[in-house]
Amino acid sequence: MMAALDAKMASMGAKPDLAAGHRITQVSIWHVPLTSHETYYMAEGKTCDTVETVVVAVKTDQGMVGWGEVCPIPHYLPAYARGVAPALTEMAPAILGADPVGPEALVARLDAYLPGHIYAKSALDIALWDITGQVAGLPLYALLGGRRQADLPLYHSITCIAPDEMARIARDAQARGMSQFQAKLGADADWQADVERLVKVREAVGPGPIVYGDWNCGATSLDASRVGRAVSHLDIMLEQPCATLDDCARVRASSGLPMKLDELAHDTESLLRAHKLAIMDAVAVKLSKFGGLSAAGRARDLCQYLGAKMCVEDTWGSDIATAAALHLGIATDPARVLNVCDLSGYVAPRVAPTAPVRTNGRISPPEGAGLGIIVDAVALGAPDVVLE
């Protein structure tokens, strides 16, 4: 198998590393249903109730195991949970026998072997970083730039339901120490109801805390502009109102409100264009949008240079995805960290029950080597797919 791979890589101008001390011998894949503690409503009928997360374990010839995770939300990005295993199966000849230490080298080979499919590569990349940290005997944040602060600010995401109920959720979260609030908008395609949602959440938490309204690309530039102009007297940020950068720029220009991007910020080109359009006051650096910790780390560095504040997180998931994002977040310039998200706090089951949880609106990454978490392999049960 490796001889055939080496010939293919040579034809692409790449050579395998024959001096490595570790080799990947097995990749195991699980599909785990994650159920939200409350149904999560977003624009255009998008919901998060029960979705599948994909857990990946990479084993080496020296018995080391690295864990990764990716959890695509249906109808959110060009990714789906049941696409991960086929993509990793296709890449298996390039994965098995490869050196997992120093993930970017292997990921570069995989990009040549199978272009695209970055969401599937994201789970693998996280597992490779976990192994790399274990080999080094260091927590991942030490390899991603070094610890920059003691803990990280969280935001609380509020499902798009009746305005008064959203205000109640915001007050309850604030009472538990939260000071940043994302209000989902557009579930009923009623721009006036969205205005009421933002006004009532803003009033509920009082002056000071960050409040932003997120359409997840689900608004027209007209409706989002009407909402923005109606709340322009308030301390509000808008998030990803429309499906194109140009429409988002129109909303920014008409409302005068700061803007955060999410779905449309997913690679170097989109980050640079959003910055040029002046619509990237803040941006969601989600691991699986970019292709894992390796690519998200490069996006982090670019955003620090461009001056954008970042929400360092992932699309959805449990403890593995949360831990990976926390390591990257804590290694980021604190002046550029808007917030992070404890995804594992919104869903059940927990795949690593002893992983960190929120405390008074903040959270810290795990301290052990690599990801620093203990995955409950017994609870996962037998894997759905084993590549070896």
Roles of regions detected by a PLM:
Residues 24, 56, 63, 91, ...:
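Conserved, mostly hydrophobic/aromatic
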Residues 142-145, 149-255:
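Metal-dependent enolase-superfamily TIM-barrel catalytic cores that perform enediolate-based chemistry
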Residues 66-68, 152-158, 181-183, 211-215, ...:
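Hydrophobic faces of well-ordered beta-strands that scaffold small-molecule active sites
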Residues 86, 234, 243-258, 265-362, ...:
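Shared catalytic-loop signature of beta/alpha-barrel
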Residues 119-120, 125-159:
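Glycine-rich, aromatic-flanked loop segments that form ligand/cofactor-binding clefts
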Residues 2-15, 19-27, 32-36, 48, ...:
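Flexible C-terminal active-site loop/helix
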Residues 54-60, 355-358:
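Short beta-strand elements
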Residues 26, 59-135:
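Metal- or metallocofactor-binding catalytic centers and their adjacent structured scaffolds
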